[in-house]
UniProtKB/Swiss-Prot annotation:
It comes from Thermus thermophilus (strain ATCC 27634 / DSM 579 / HB8). [4Fe-4S] cluster binds at residues 441, 507, 510. GO terms for molecular function: 2-methylisocitrate dehydratase activity; 4 iron, 4 sulfur cluster binding; aconitate hydratase activity; metal ion binding; mRNA 3'-UTR binding; mRNA binding. The keyword Cytoplasm does not apply. Its EC number is 4.2.1.3, 4.2.1.99. It is an enzyme of class 4 (lyase). One of its GO terms (biological process) is propionate metabolic process, methylcitrate cycle. This is Aconitate hydratase A.
Amino acid sequence: MKNSFQTLKTLTTKSGTYGYYDLQELERKGVAEVSRLPFSIRVMLESLLRNEDGYQVTREDIEALARWRPDPGEINVPLKLARVILQDFTGVPAVVDLAAMRDAIKAKGGDPKRINPVVPADLVIDHSVQVDAFGTAYAFFYNVEKEYERNRERYLLLKWAQNALENFRVVPPGTGIVHQVNIEYLTKVVMTGKRDGLTLAFPDSLVGTDSHTTMVNGLGVLGWGVGGIEAEAVMLGQPYYMLAPRVVGFKLYGELPEGATATDLVLTVTEMLRKHGVVGKFVEFYGPGVAKLSTPDRATIANMAPEYGATMGFFPVDEETLNYLRQTGRPEELVELVEAYTKAVGLFRTPEAEEKVQYSEYLELDLSAVEPSLAGPKRPQDRVPLKEVKKSFLAHLTKPVKERGFGLSEDQLQRKVLVKRRDEEFELTHGSVVIAAITSCTNTSNPSVMLGAGLLAKKAVEAGLDRKPWVKTSLAPGSKVVTDYLEMSGLMPFLEALGFHLVGYGCTTCIGNSGPLPEDIAKAVEEGNLVVAAVLSGNRNFEGRINPHVKANYLASPMLVVAYALAGRMDIDFTTEPLGFDPNGKPIYLKDIWPSMEEIREAIRKTLDPELFKKEYSKVFEGDERWQALPAPTGELYQWDPESTYIQNPPFFEDLGERKVEDIRGARVLLVLGDSVTTDHISPAGAIPVKSPAGQYLISKGVKPEDFNSYGSRRGNHEVMMRGTFANIRIKNLMLDGIEGGYAKKLPEGDVDFVYNVAMRYKAEGTPLLVIAGKEYGTGSSRDWAAKGTYLLGIRAVLAESFERIHRSNLVGMGVLPLEFLPGENRETLGLTGYEVYDILGLEDLKPRKLVDIVARREDGSEVRFQAIARLDTPVEVDYYKNGGILQTVLLNMLKEAKATE
């Protein structure tokens, strides 16, 4: 490695002597004023200094980033990251790709063992558990049993990977949620590694195959979500290429008032940042209010960066970070190293250091103005103060669908359905809460809101309140430590008394694994076509995500989740209406059972012990007896089973070789879509309908509908996933009138069929395909199958008004061209309907962000000519596109290197 600026120094702690690259030396040498750089940019700069090789990372790269300005312009940053994290929904297809790459390199005469993570990778199995059983003491055991039954093939693949791949660890099922395991155990904040006989210290940094990887930003660790294909490239030693971002400085001051929680704060921050516009930017928090937030509070805010649209929500390392490392049982010598290193290198936050920093844009929030809130019913940025939820929900019932309402007429509002059970009967109506889920790493990582929920449950039970019988209740924490401290505090029995029994350690309801509603409830919802609600402590509430029967979804703190389980309806004003009545008929209001901050702090003091973390994480990679009993396949190549409906060798590397890039001519439009189309819309993760192309494929393979599992669990099989692309029941193809769901029109014939069937007919004719969309295309999860499925359907380009960051780069990574309308232009202004035939010209000599010419020929022979920006943002992305994708580029380079050394 080079050291052009002579910044390599040493520091000594009790645990030894470490080499480190001193950022502050650049300032002393007059290269750049590093002290005015945002802390997040400094972490990136350190990576460049440490990895300068004159080829992938050059002296010029370092100088350009060191001289970052609030309006940074075009600075290409080749980031070398310290590690990669994966979850199993996105991790399984990544492992499938690595296995397929081993096959491909062997077929070309190369060594399969060259395909190995160079960068350490940890995969946490958390996305597969579903809430089949709930509300009973045996729910956890039943759900885990079902999880293993459904996912045996996938888990065998992951065990093969654990054995066959170097630098690859797996956290088995039933252990925790990836981001919570990451902040409580995996991240060290400061890493060490050997180079040239010296032990180097350097900041932890990572990418993850899940958009909420940003949670670790709460500990001052650089990290964000990427698609599986990009994560694989990083694992294989490729730099992660990005443009230096604008950094929004978000000042926090004051203190949270009594009654407000970290959840209320994050929903407020999300609303503010979505309004401000932070897509593609870093957000860095500073100011006196930061010191008033615990690390779990910060991690809650960082977790929801995808919801506010930022690449990161960054809190620099400070005294509170060190406290958290101690609280979670990290070794004292690590804490000492983190403190010594971050102070030596200029990465430790102090009020004096903050004052010098220059940001691109500024926002501020007085924490004392935060009030109890929910977000919904369809988007995480749509915050509603608790006191206005009733009014807001009732208004949404009749609001038009295009204004994110439910479009009910006045006479539909009165619908009620009587449900009769053996020992009771009750009415369901619009606004009945049918799911109340304490779920998601966003909140279950935060002891204050979890113990708060337990205290609220205790007071409710003591007042004689109970959950409503139509509410499906669940508790799914992100780590075993949560149940340990809930049990130690004596609060678990009160949560269980209200039906909040442990259902699993995993994502569950937050990602749509809410399991089926009880049959009588589902039937009543269908019969009355009711707009029923879910209240969850998650981070996403997009339509159609949580449960196919539930149209209104609200994000809330765990305490409010319990409150809505007691109320059983959204049309309640907690400030004026009682939750229920005690045995003497006395009304009980929410304020009567809401725990005080002092009660919560006292519960934390009594129960949160570093030994809990040490105990649970000492065996984090072991798994239960089921995991240990799985017969792990061996060998450097994976043995594909042609009969498997979970794992198949994908066709991505069949035509490996440099391709000639040509103009796209004679393209037809498969779908015209509106704004905020999510990756959930493009590639759903939840249930597979029987009559869908994916369902019919599985039936043809002898799979019974009750064994379909979910789309997310079948991401290792491209045959299922390409059939599931654009198959969300809530997607709206604007080329079709009055039809919702995954349908398209075959042109010029004009007949309507499933998207997959129409795409295959076009493919048979050799017709390239195009998708046209509005703003924020691809928002939501970092789901690489949204790009892989797009590619496999034969879609060559996506033309949108704007793209969410991860999905745009995933499209490039699959060799699909993202095209952006020029500012002020869109489908409507240009009069495009989707019935035209398209030529996309000027692709032979592509360069970053080139303007390409598009000709749209209408049915009457007239033409619309316009230009669009080819969103290949860096020279490297142009190469990826030319080679057919990022993994193809990596393989081609490996084969070239192997030839050169022969």
